[in-house]
From Swiss-Prot:
Residues 2-246 form the ABC transporter domain. One of its GO terms (molecular function) is ATP binding. CDD domains: ABC_PhnC_transporter. It catalyses: phosphonate(out) + ATP + H2O = phosphonate(in) + ADP + phosphate + H(+). It comes from Lactobacillus johnsonii (strain CNCM I-12250 / La1 / NCC 533). InterPro entries: AAA+_ATPase (IPR003593), ABC_transporter-like_ATP-bd (IPR003439), ABC_transporter-like_CS (IPR017871), ABC_transpr_PhnC (IPR012693), MetN_ABC_transporter-like (IPR050086), P-loop_NTPase (IPR027417). It is an enzyme of class 7 (translocase). Belongs to the ABC transporter superfamily. Phosphonates importer (TC 3.A.1.9.1) family. Its main location: membrane. Keywords: ATP-binding, Cell membrane, Membrane, Nucleotide-binding, Phosphonate transport, Translocase, Transport. This is Phosphonates import ATP-binding protein PhnC. The lineage of its organism: Bacteria, Bacillati, Bacillota, Bacilli, Lactobacillales. Part of the ABC transporter complex PhnCDE involved in phosphonates import. Responsible for energy coupling to the transport system. One of its GO terms (cellular component) is plasma membrane. The keyword Cell wall biogenesis/degradation does not apply.
Length: 254
């Protein structure tokens, strides 16, 4: 489903974000990516969705190159990829419902979504998504009146409304307390198991990675240094991922 072929990313100042990455991700996997801050985890996810261009190599999504896609082709590929960010990326002054409905924007011309011309079916999808994350009672609440955990669950409902094949979650629990973090991860696991969505999540917490990941990818200094089943991954492997390098930060925040 997702193929990275000899992918490298070098920033303008010479910092290496990714170095010769080769990776295959199959449909329906729940993958956690771990490593020090600056190791290349966020660069990896942002490259898959082409939020940034790679310097070398190719990224294939369902047989189509997102690296070279343009215009309509690029929009169609991205429509199948949902993003969840550490900072939630909600419109704070808008209602929860309006934020969740933005998951449908990839299906319409810009002018329709600008004027909030969503269909009754879209609104029903949004409401059902909020039910799945236990926030149906917050439909008309402004996003900035919610707790951090609730805002992240709104972001998950938005992704569910989008109905993508792939979810890329970039440190989705970094700013949350342990209990709320676990709830957010349970919601992501629900999307994976019940809807068949492929999930790739960057995590700082090794504990959460062990609890929810089926496969773990270790990243250090822009390179994949480990790739294996979680059930076969020892604590010593995690220790090596985090301590085996010099830990220098690159030009990214995770």
């Amino acid at each position: 489903m997702i193929q990275l072929k000899n992918v490298s990313k070098i920033y303008d100042n010479g910092t290496v974000g990714l170095k010769d990455i080769n990776l295959n991700i199959d449909k329906g996997e729940f993958i956690v990516v771990v490593g020090l801050s600056g190791a290349g985890k966020s660069t990896l996810l942002r490259s898959i969705n082409r939020l940034q261009d790679v310097s070398e190599g190719d990224i294939i999504i369902d047989g189509k190159s997102i690296t070279s896609a343009k215009g309509k082709d690029l929009r169609e590929i991205r429509r199948d990829i949902g993003m969840i960010f550490q900072s939630f990326n909600l419109v704070k002054r808008s209602s929860v419902l309006r934020n969740v409905l933005t998951g449908r924007v990839g299906y319409y011309p810009t002018w329709k979504t600008t004027f909030n011309l969503f269909t009754k079916e879209d609104k029903q999808k949004a409401y059902e998504a909020l039910q799945r994350v236990d926030l149906a009672d917050k439909v008309y609440t402004r996003a900035d009146q919610l707790s951090g955990g609730q805002q992240q669950r709104v972001a998950i409902a938005r992704v569910l409304t989008q109905n993508p094949k792939i979810i890329l979650a970039d440190e989705p629990t970094a700013s949350l307390d342990p209990q709320t973090s676990r709830r957010v991860m349970h919601d992501l696991k629900m999307l994976n198991e019940e809807y068949g969505m492929t999930v790739v999540a960057n995590l700082h917490s090794v504990e959460l990675a062990k609890e929810f990941g089926d496969r773990v990818i270790g990243v250090r200094a822009g390179q994949i240094v480990y790739d294996g089943k979680m059930s076969e991954t020892s604590q010593a492997v995690f220790d090596d991922i985090y301590n085996g390098g010099n830990g220098k930060k690159g030009e990214e925040d995770a």
